[in-house]
């Protein structure tokens, strides 16, 4: 599954990119809220009350807010995983539809129709010879 995710994330397919942008925009706020309001506090409890967003290194009056960076990476990973799962389900449904189309009996070609007519004529000739 990891290899599939890497292929998905790094291939240059325009449709996958478009789907990712649309789905990412649609679910971005929901996933961000999930991460910010549910997952991060749970991780904070497990890790001893750590809140990633407040993590920083202070140099005098300046601060490096690396906690926000960790939070942003975490948001990205969850959004990317959600998009990946959506595309995987979409591709699976699409491939099932294609398999169903392949199972349908195709219309006979002109050659097949002509060969069928020749077969029928030969049967008629053979049956008329048998009667005579």
UniProtKB/Swiss-Prot annotation:
<keyword id="KW-1003">Cell membrane</keyword>
<dbReference type="InterPro" id="IPR019823">
    <property type="entry name" value="Mechanosensitive_channel_CS"/>
</dbReference>
<comment type="subunit">
    <text>Homopentamer.</text>
</comment>
<keyword id="KW-0812">Transmembrane</keyword>
<dbReference type="InterPro" id="IPR036019">
    <property type="entry name" value="MscL_channel"/>
</dbReference>
<comment type="function">
    <text>Channel that opens in response to stretch forces in the membrane lipid bilayer. May participate in the regulation of osmotic pressure changes within the cell.</text>
</comment>
<dbReference type="GO" id="GO:0008381">
    <property type="term" value="F:mechanosensitive monoatomic ion channel activity"/>
</dbReference>
<keyword id="KW-1133">Transmembrane helix</keyword>
<feature type="transmembrane region" description="Helical">
    <location>
        <begin position="14"/>
        <end position="34"/>
    </location>
</feature>
<dbReference type="GO" id="GO:0005886">
    <property type="term" value="C:plasma membrane"/>
</dbReference>
<dbReference type="InterPro" id="IPR001185">
    <property type="entry name" value="MS_channel"/>
</dbReference>
<comment type="similarity">
    <text>Belongs to the MscL family.</text>
</comment>
<keyword id="KW-0406">Ion transport</keyword>
<keyword id="KW-0813">Transport</keyword>
<keyword id="KW-0407">Ion channel</keyword>
<dbReference type="InterPro" id="IPR037673">
    <property type="entry name" value="MSC/AndL"/>
</dbReference>
<dbReference type="Pfam" id="PF01741">
    <property type="entry name" value="MscL"/>
</dbReference>
<keyword id="KW-0472">Membrane</keyword>
<protein>
    <recommendedName>
        <fullName>Large-conductance mechanosensitive channel</fullName>
    </recommendedName>
</protein>
<feature type="transmembrane region" description="Helical">
    <location>
        <begin position="67"/>
        <end position="87"/>
    </location>
</feature>
